Curated annotation (Swiss-Prot):
<dbReference type="GO" id="GO:0003824">
    <property type="term" value="F:catalytic activity"/>
</dbReference>
<protein>
    <recommendedName>
        <fullName>Uncharacterized protein R802</fullName>
    </recommendedName>
</protein>
<dbReference type="GO" id="GO:0009116">
    <property type="term" value="P:nucleoside metabolic process"/>
</dbReference>
<dbReference type="InterPro" id="IPR000845">
    <property type="entry name" value="Nucleoside_phosphorylase_d"/>
</dbReference>
<dbReference type="InterPro" id="IPR035994">
    <property type="entry name" value="Nucleoside_phosphorylase_sf"/>
</dbReference>
<dbReference type="Pfam" id="PF01048">
    <property type="entry name" value="PNP_UDP_1"/>
</dbReference>
Amino acid sequence: MEIPYITPAKLLSTNVLPLNGVKTAFVCFCPMPSVFSKYRLNVEVNTRLFLHVHNMHIMFGQYGATKFIVITEVYGGPVGVTIVEELKHYGIDKIIGIGFVGSFDPAIKTGSIVDAEKSLIEHGTTPHYLSADTKYTFPTLKIELPQLNVNKVCIWTTNALYREFKSDIIEAKNKQCSVVNMDTSHLYAACELLNVSCRYFAVVSDMLDLDGAENWSNDLTDAINHNDSDISVSMSSLIDHIIRQLN
């Protein structure tokens, strides 16, 4: 079997995580959610840990006996799967993806929490991590959040943020999708191949009504600028509930 020419072991051979016993990672396809600050550990990082993410976008935290690393500002499939490969190199065996999605289902409104029960694949990053021709990728980590109102969804993983046309959305809806992002199928595919358990949750940041007069309602701008909104409240609640499941 062929092996890749470039590997995390080659690029990061002298690097180790500065905290022992870390097996869980939050990979955030968004800016650092403020709720993580209350779990932060004072850990000094002296070397760059990830090829595509600066150390200013990572932190270490702890809840009870569980230590974890948080990596933020991870955008798009290629960067996402690179982070997964590097986390595997560091001994991480559990990844929780966090991010935003856009909804085109009127029943799933801005501020709603979604659990990626599966994710529709587009041609691009994902197929490099699959051994079979399939339309969907699936989570391998079981996390239930019964205290929250969580929508089980199929996420359309698109490759081009500024190229979401009406015909594409109709096709995605016909394939069982109700929300869209650029991350989930790549994350699931990379984790499955590398034997890392994973589940992705997100908060709806914007909505598209194909039949409405104003087609797109946008709260994403506020969300990425950390402005107070229903989105930030939902994100804080979501992360708090996930962290309480870690022990």
